[in-house]
A protein has these predicted regions:
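Acidic/polar, low-complexity intrinsically disordered N-terminal segments immediately downstream
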Residues: 1-160, 379
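Ser/Thr/Gly/Pro-rich, low-complexity flexible regions
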Residues: 122-380
Length: 380
């Protein structure tokens, strides 16, 4: 039997990362990229990678010429910030395969990486500085350790039915940093924090789910779709759009060593629910909303004809980029009732070394609760 059963098709090059695919320009952290081939190579091979939209060399590759030995099919390399502090606006940079030495190879995907300008911490007012001193005297609570750029570790567990839909794996864990300040709602008696950049370390995760709910949704991107008409009308360009998130009203309860952080917020249907009051902003949505506010119209396809439609009416119809699709149901009790339950009780705690949160979270096309657990290390 001399039949050769070895795979002779295209050897696809797949890239992935389990790290947070977003960096601040000042970050020392690297994004580790895993390379996986469909099948092992017969001879030693080299794959070269490159970064698009990387003017001024904002990012750099470490070992970007990846060598794969005969008989192997995996490799990894790193992407780092050059830490030049040049950016004024967020930038999306695309990592792609440049070339390769094995003619059977073919790129399977690209990776989108986000680089944010260095977050700046607003100066506290004199009154806020007094509050912080007061918390030390009143509660023996050094709030300075909770503020500034604070490092965290995040663990995300998806509902079982969402694996293959919203995520390739059931759990993910990654490192991040949040920029935290004293909330304008803090008082002399009530220490309240506000996360002004990368709240809970999950901005990239929220942006990924938002894209899957909207611009990457297969029901959006077909020929003649009103969604496509909307994106053309606003000049949608993913590499230039900015998606940002803020989280206010994280109140420390010093006597208990806990946080109160769940509060009323509005969902897609303008119903008040109990959840984390994330405040989302997205540049493409701002432009679409402005067109509606100014009474704008666009041409859309109805059957075989192009007709003029008011942007306000289209938004009413659900042709929208509003990030409120990331707000769905109350998390103070189990509204999904999946078997087994994927709900966890929302909790926030702090001690001398760390502060941590756990909470269930869902979005419009969820199939249950995603469980999010975040642990911050207090600044020294």
């Amino acid at each position: 039997n001399n039949i050769d059963y070895t795979y002779k098709g295209r050897n696809y090059i797949q890239m992935s990362t389990s790290d947070d695919p977003a960096l601040s320009e000042s970050d020392e952290r690297a994004i580790t990229v895993d390379v996986l081939l469909a099948t092992s190579v017969e001879n030693d091979a080299v794959i070269n990678f490159e970064l698009l939209d990387n003017a001024d060399d904002i990012l750099r590759l470490e070992n970007g010429a990846v060598q794969i030995k005969a008989g192997e099919k995996t490799a990894r390399f790193k992407v780092l910030s050059n830490r030049q502090s040049l950016l004024n606006n967020q930038r999306m940079i695309t990592l792609k395969v440049k070339d390769y030495t094995d003619e059977r190879m073919q790129p399977w995907n690209e990776l989108k990486l986000t680089v944010r300008p260095n977050p700046t911490l607003p100066d506290l007012t004199e009154q806020q500085i007094e509050f912080v001193h007061g918390y030390m005297e009143k509660y023996r609570l050094n709030l300075n350790r909770f503020m500034g750029e604070v490092s965290c570790r995040v663990e995300v567990t998806f509902p079982a039915d969402e694996v293959g839909v919203f995520s390739d794996t059931e759990t993910r864990s990654f490192e991040g940093k949040s920029m935290i300040t004293l909330s304008e709602n803090a008082t002399a008696d009530r220490p309240i924090l506000k996360m002004i950049d990368n709240p809970m370390g999950i901005t990239s995760f929220l942006w990924e789910i938002y894209r899957k709910e909207t611009v990457e949704n297969e029901f959006w991107i077909f020929e003649g779709s009103k969604y496509v008409s909307m994106m053309e009308a606003i000049g949608y360009d993913m590499s230039k759009e900015v998606f940002s998130v803020v989280l206010d009203n994280l109140e420390l309860l010093p006597d208990e060593g806990t946080f109160s952080f769940v509060g009323p917020t509005l969902n897609l249907w303008d119903e008040e629910i109990e959840s984390l009051p994330f405040e989302y902003s997205f540049t493409a949505w701002e432009r679409w909303k402005k067109m509606a506010d100014e009474g704008g119209t666009i041409l859309v396809q109805e059957g075989d004809n192009m007709v003029e439609a008011s942007v306000s009416d289209l938004i009413e119809e659900g042709i929208t980029l509003n990030p409120v699709c990331l707000v769905y149901s109350s998390i103070d009790e189990d509204n999904w009732e999946n078997e087994p339950s994927d709900w966890i009780e929302p909790k926030g705690m702090f001690n001398e070394k760390t502060f941590s949160f756990q909470f269930p979270w869902d979005h419009v096309n969820s199939l249950g609760y995603t469980q999010i657990r975040v642990t911050y290390t207090l600044n020294e």
